[in-house]
From Swiss-Prot:
Heterodimer of LeuC and LeuD. Belongs to the aconitase/IPM isomerase family. LeuC type 2 subfamily. This is 3-isopropylmalate dehydratase large subunit. Keywords: 4Fe-4S, Amino-acid biosynthesis, Branched-chain amino acid biosynthesis, Iron, Iron-sulfur, Leucine biosynthesis, Lyase, Metal-binding. Pathway: Amino-acid biosynthesis; L-leucine biosynthesis; L-leucine from 3-methyl-2-oxobutanoate: step 2/4. It comes from Clostridium acetobutylicum (strain ATCC 824 / DSM 792 / JCM 1419 / IAM 19013 / LMG 5710 / NBRC 13948 / NRRL B-527 / VKM B-1787 / 2291 / W). Disulfide bonds: none annotated.
Amino acid sequence: MKKPMTMTQKILANHAGLDYVEAGQLITANLDLVLGNDVTTPVAVKAFKTMGTNKVFDKKKVAIVPDHFTPNKDIKSAEHCKMIRQFAKSKEIENYFEIGEMGIEHALIPEKGLAVPGDVIIGADSHTCTYGALGVFSTGVGSTDMAVGMATGKAWFKVPEAIKFVLKGKPAKWVSGKDIILHIIGMIGVDGALYKSMEYTGDGLEYLSMDDRFTIANMAIEAGAKNGIFPVDEKTIEYMKGRSDRELKKFDADEDAEYSRVIEIDLSTLKPTVAFPHLPENTKTIDQVGEVNVDQVVIGSCTNGRMEDLRIAASILKGKKIKKGIRLIVFPGTQNIYLEAMEEGLVRTFIEAGGIVSTPTCGPCLGGHMGILAEGERAISTTNRNFVGRMGHPKSEVYLASPAVAAASAIAGKIVSPEEVL
């Protein structure tokens, strides 16, 4: 009799050529995509060159996205990008994305149809878990793992245990995927899902857009998880239309699959949520925030730089001005999102409100460039991490929130609910 498995276990078993896997088992799985960026790929290239091979395992299944320090912020980052550009050309890697066609990797990869339901994907970036929104097993790895993946098309894994999140009910207005995942991390902690799979189910999924799901899956790593994953449904299938010719594979968890925990969440009871410094678990609902003034507002990133995020922010900012002295930085997730935001008039809205709109980049999120904080400064940001010094000076502060709360806070000059400015 076949033993029951979770979504993640079924995908891993399929890619390992096994009928069944269980938590804790060590396996070797075939990979559908190996991903790197301009920070992690140079190290992977050096490791690759020591492996005695001159070819990547599949020119179509390696993707390199220069996004962290691009457009190049200094000579060192320019040299890194030159190195990986030459490597991609020499290995005839088809999915190397130059800055004119690039985006923040975890917004770009799904947009380009390179993540397909049922895939196993590794990326030398911790937020590779984003693609779980599409029913993909995807996880971050080190640069040497990326090198081995590029050479062999394989990676080894310890099959994770799973936590089942049963989402029920309809979220209230202004409650988004960001608020849901911040609520979850606040509840279980930054190590609450350590090396576990966060698997989402329940009737509440029908109210979550694909952009909401990308946000929730993106921040699985902030709870210490190996991956986050959603079941494939009509919304997934609709999103994938026209993006890939590859077969979509649906792996549903067995009803009697084993979970280390089952957590039920009534989405209708949630409120807009803010993570205070210096951990994503340090959450408060918007009515508990109090008087917190901010210097900078950042809207974008691989967490919240998609069209729905920009539309929500623009709907609050339209016809209004941000408070004098506040710096508003908006960075769309990809060039296509940027273009669509221009065509819809969202870019005009942001600029007329007093903000700037940046090319797609990871820059501000990791304290790299395009919006660094000085000593004592405070930012509210739609990004995913608020560790000490994450966005600049060690004595600066980062508050994590949704695009709606961030946009409202830009107008008020302090952290507020959208209702307070509308």
